[in-house]
Amino acid sequence: PVIYGGTGNGPAFIERTADIHQAVQDIIASKTFDNGVVSAAEQSVVVDSCIAAEVRLEFEASGAYFMTEEEAERLGKLFYFKDGSANPELAGKAAEDLARWAKIDVPAGTKVLLAEQKYVSENNPYSKEKLCPVLSYFIEDDWMHACEKCIELLLSERHGHTLVIHSKDPDVIHQFAIKKPVGRMLVNTPAVYGSMGATTNLFPAMTLGSGSAGQGITSDNVSPMNLIYVRKVGYGVRRIEDLGMGTPADASGCRGAAADEDSLRKLQRLLEDALASINNQL
């Protein structure tokens, strides 16, 4: 079987209770690691509208450049060829080099380029994975709209990988955790470092599974446990004749004595039907 790491198109949401300075520093540190070639790196930033102005100022003070609509369009045309394939020449290139190719005049020392967007679409290069220090930037009215925007971004290109949220509100964090189609959700940490276990307690790994949602076999950080061969031995604990006599299996390993009686009756009926079908064929 193939252990599939998957395409990352992970957004980072900066919620109104976040430590804005730390959130921006985390995102820039993550997106500039290896100039953005790590799939787990942030691809988009989604910001709560009430703090958008402060977040923008923090980005600009930290070496980020917000492109004009025209500049973003020029750079966006370089990401993909006419046949839809990605341009490998842009992968891992520094922000200043990318700006030079797109004829964008940026301040010396620019670390990251940002393109403000409103919509997610299949033909928008800023809705996809960008293996370079370029981020799309969305402003949403509240965390609920931001939640939907993050889902849009995740579903736009093989979901299942990674999501980041910067917030101090446990209820918002919980809502994001239970709703997003991702293998890992990171809280108040850089995506690259957090996903590989450097700044979190996730298993240290460079191959990050995306699970069945991302067309893989695991959503774990791939470890030696995904690669070793484990033989399991199962001893017989009941006879076939017992299956039709109301003797349920010992479920102590998963549900224990609190197993639902109705579920057991349904299981018994299914087993009885299966045995009857087998006997009719003998």
Locations of the language-model features?
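Intrinsic structural disorder
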Residues: 1, 11-14, 23, 28, ...
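ALDH superfamily catalytic-core signature
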Residues: 1-121
